[in-house]
């Protein structure tokens, strides 16, 4: 269910500011999101929306695929816009999916994806494969510290940003968790063994909210006089660690430079602060 304003669909005059003001003052009703799906592809309707002479709707993506022929009645479709339905879409306010966790934000239909990525109330999953806990990134930090700190397998360490630290992990363990104490963040160091070598990547378990901050990092691996380094202007922020080999933002260590299962690296994390 979503919150929706219906009076905006009846407004047909006034400048942009007046339309926004009237939209915000309009009545609120409940709608089922399913009725906002294209009846053909079942994807969410977005402008432009078309209709045939019998009133059957079709989204802009479906019309060309149907050769502009309505599948319900075979009448032409793709030439006449459904302005009424487009006005309804413009009037709909959707509460954040994290409303039950405390988020009070709402946004107009079609703008929800941008907010969800940055919502501070987004639920983050515990990186332990034997734990199904989810919570805000700060609650996850507290949970991990309390529940998994004594688990040697996870080898939790604490460090501060803007400092080099050396980390050791077994490639077969695949993941190592570090705690950033002052930020209440969990840093996941992951490695993936593939035929061409070992992929190493790091990420914070947190949403992409401004409150979390932005960070850059450097990885360095040294063995027998050989050095492999990788620098990135951004530490990825994820709500759940992936078990898939990364396609970007990784350091690749060839098998010829590996010495058994132990992987020892130097990591440098620094918070990016705008200089104004």
Swiss-Prot record:
Zinc-finger ranges (RING-type): 38-74
Keywords: Metal-binding, Transferase, Ubl conjugation pathway, Zinc, Zinc-finger
Region (SBD): 88-274
Sequence positions that bind Zn(2+) 2: 126, 131, 143, 148
Enzyme Commission code(s) on record: 2.3.2.27
Gene Ontology MF terms in the entry: transferase activity; zinc ion binding
Biological process, per Gene Ontology: protein ubiquitination
Residues given in the record as Zn(2+) 1 binding sites: 96, 103, 115, 119
One Pfam family of this chain: Sina_ZnF
Pathway named in the protein's UniProt entry: Protein modification; protein ubiquitination
Zinc finger (SIAH-type): 91-149
Catalytic activity: S-ubiquitinyl-[E2 ubiquitin-conjugating enzyme]-L-cysteine + [acceptor protein]-L-lysine = [E2 ubiquitin-conjugating enzyme]-L-cysteine + N(6)-ubiquitinyl-[acceptor protein]-L-lysine
EC category name: transferase
Role of this protein: E3 ubiquitin-protein ligase that mediates ubiquitination and subsequent proteasomal degradation of target proteins. E3 ubiquitin ligases accept ubiquitin from an E2 ubiquitin-conjugating enzyme in the form of a thioester and then directly transfers the ubiquitin to targeted substrates. It probably triggers the ubiquitin-mediated degradation of different substrates.
Domain comment (free text): The RING-type zinc finger domain is essential for ubiquitin ligase activity. The SBD domain (substrate-binding domain) mediates the homodimerization and the interaction with substrate proteins. It is related to the TRAF family.
Family, per entry: Belongs to the SINA (Seven in absentia) family.
Name used for this protein in its record: Putative E3 ubiquitin-protein ligase SINA-like 9
Organism, as annotated: Arabidopsis thaliana (Mouse-ear cress)
